[in-house]
């Protein structure tokens, strides 16, 4: 089974998409999550929502910290990622900014092998995260601290390369568990792994993913940015209202066709996605407070300098968000 998970993961990496539509503005966009955030992005592509906004978007999967490197290099000048790398690169003089809050609640559960009955039993047992510095890493460390552990001292943390590889690591017994999100989370439950905690019960606010770009790109190409966020906003509505659209993306893009997994993903994720997708200040504050403990260079940075609400505010005030709320 671990080989199957890894093969599916590799297959997803290998499939960029180009909506080669005449008269559209070409742009490459990165997404760094094979979960609800990634599904929304594929809905925007497959349902023609980018094209509807005059964009010819090529979606490229870029994992973890590499997504920020791709953005800074200009390879993918806009994309979906977390707020953590925004703080880190801006501390060194960059101008990155989150302009759209896609997922504003923790979407992960800490899943463990069946022999682990309680969090007290985690001491000395390695757990996996996608990549160091990612949301899985920070959320796991914050959870361990709430349980009284010193991360890496009491509980080893291994970098696995993505969320599906965390499950693969549990299957191969390389690790005892780690944070998983849908649809991988549903598969883990089906296979008998234990849900130790829904992280949202420990950490209710957390800016998991959003649309990130550079202020220079906003100034240079405001219509691309505007069209991108409008497409993403409508894709969220489609995700919430059209189970078939979710099923299609999961089957054709993620190669997942298990009805139970698809249904749980479609029913669960909407509660993590705000109707008015501003980046979550409380969710960002939680992250910054945690980062400040170990990364002193980030302490002088303000939350306001890491976000730009103009495009969401424009959609809200124009009535666009109400217009698309029933989109299918």
Where are these regions (language model features)?
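Short linear loop/turn motifs
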Residues: 58, 65-66, 155-158, 263-270, ...
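Short, glycine-/small- and polar/acidic-enriched structural segments
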Residues: 20-172, 176-182, 195-199, 204-205
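Bacterial N-terminal signal peptides
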Residues: 3-15
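Secondary-structure end/capping motifs
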Residues: 219-300
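Predominant activation on well-ordered alpha-helical scaffold segments within soluble catalytic domains
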Residues: 42, 87, 141, 186-189, ...
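Conserved C-terminal helix/tail region of periplasmic/extracytoplasmic solute-binding proteins
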Residues: 292-328
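Basic/polar N-terminal segments that are highly enriched at the extreme N-terminus
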Residues: 1, 16-22, 328
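Pocket-lining segment of extracytoplasmic ligand-binding domains
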Residues: 84-85, 164-255
